[in-house]
Amino acid sequence: METPSNPLLRITDIAAAAELAHSSAGKRTVVAVDNTFCSPILQQPLSLDADLVIASDTKFLNGHSDVIGGSVVAANQQDVDLIAFHANMMGLTASPLDSWLTLRGLRTLGVRMQAHCANAARMVEILQSHQAVTAVYWPG
């Protein structure tokens, strides 16, 4: 699931979705959350019983628009091992430079997300008071 969703920023209750998915009988149901929009600063899906967290590192995590990459974080070692095996076999691992560039961006992630949220809140104020704007989609 992607929450907030793109483009309407609809919110899914991750914990409720995970509870429903994990309570189903039969095969294991994996709950995966695309956390690109929120980053780990604003939302921690593993703490809400998601099994996998997926993100586009190109966006907020990197912060400098100089890396193309993504990440998958798993809640249990079995999933970590399975993902690592397939990523290694298929050559889907990041280069050392891309890894370093992403780590560089992570140093300022908290400050940048704080600024993004403040700027977005101000834009919402402006747009909601503008007579030509009929709807503002804002989960905050």
Feature names for model-found ranges:
Residues 140:
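Conserved PLP cofactor-binding pocket of PLP-dependent enzymes
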Residues 1-132, 137:
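Conserved PLP-enzyme active-site core in the AAT-like
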